[in-house]
Amino acid sequence: MNHLFVLFVNYHGFVGDNDSIVLNLMAARYFDSREEAEEHRIELYGNERYEFQNRISILEWL
């Protein structure tokens, strides 16, 4: 049985001192295995170049 893993990324950050912005950018990507998705999740979670907090979840379909 094949499994489908999708990685969704939510960005939440701040612009300026008083302005906040929530970008619900659902960047979906498909992976063949949970391990591959987890490796990419860890890779994305460490990326802070835009000073956004990365909220990442993996959804699994059987």
PLM features: residue spans?
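Short, mixed-charge low-complexity intrinsically disordered segments
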Residues: 25-30, 38-62
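Short aromatic-glycine-(Arg/Gly/Cys) micro-motifs in beta-strand/loop hairpins
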Residues: 1-26, 53-56
